[in-house]
């Protein structure tokens, strides 16, 4: 299968850099899969799973909001955070989920509501990734 160069970058680190056969992430329009020779485009990246097929193996991760620049021979994903399932503290993710759910039960401003929804989505994506690992 044809490959392309993939970089997944966060403000803290170069999360992934190398050849990939496929990358799948959640975008604002739903799940997006990219193969080599994809038409050039820019896409928003939403909170959720990131799956990379590199050297015939699938690598699972969780990313938060960001952007993907897609070119025929290269994809660059810039995201606030990216984590492998083994890096996720399950207890911390459960506590974050509970806090976000409690905040959503209160009367909130529109901004606070959106922040709480994002926090809940992030916590749920992190927990989902750890559940898939087991």
From Swiss-Prot:
Localization annotation: Cell membrane
Domain of life: Bacteria
GO-annotated cellular components: plasma membrane; proton-transporting ATP synthase complex
SUPFAM superfamilies: Epsilon subunit of F1F0-ATP synthase C-terminal domain (SSF46604), Epsilon subunit of F1F0-ATP synthase N-terminal domain (SSF51344)
Entry-linked Gene3D superfamilies: ATP synthase delta/epsilon subunit, C-terminal domain, F0F1 ATP synthase delta/epsilon subunit, N-terminal
A GO molecular-function annotation: proton-transporting ATP synthase activity, rotational mechanism
Coiled-coil spans in chain: none
Disulfide bond residue pairs: none
Keywords: ATP synthesis, Cell membrane, CF(1), Hydrogen ion transport, Ion transport, Membrane, Transport
InterPro entries associated with the record: ATP_F1_dsu/esu_C_sf, ATP_synth_F1_dsu/esu, ATP_synth_F1_dsu/esu_N, ATP_synth_F1_esu_C, ATPsynth_dsu/esu_N
Protein topology in the membrane: Peripheral membrane protein
Main localization of the protein described in the UniProt heading: membrane
Xref: HAMAP family: ATP_synth_epsil_bac (MF_00530)
UniProt function note: Produces ATP from ADP in the presence of a proton gradient across the membrane.
Subunit structure: F-type ATPases have 2 components, CF(1) - the catalytic core - and CF(0) - the membrane proton channel. CF(1) has five subunits: alpha(3), beta(3), gamma(1), delta(1), epsilon(1). CF(0) has three main subunits: a, b and c.
Family, similarity comment: Belongs to the ATPase epsilon chain family.
Protein name (Swiss-Prot/TrEMBL): ATP synthase epsilon chain
Gene for this chain: atpC
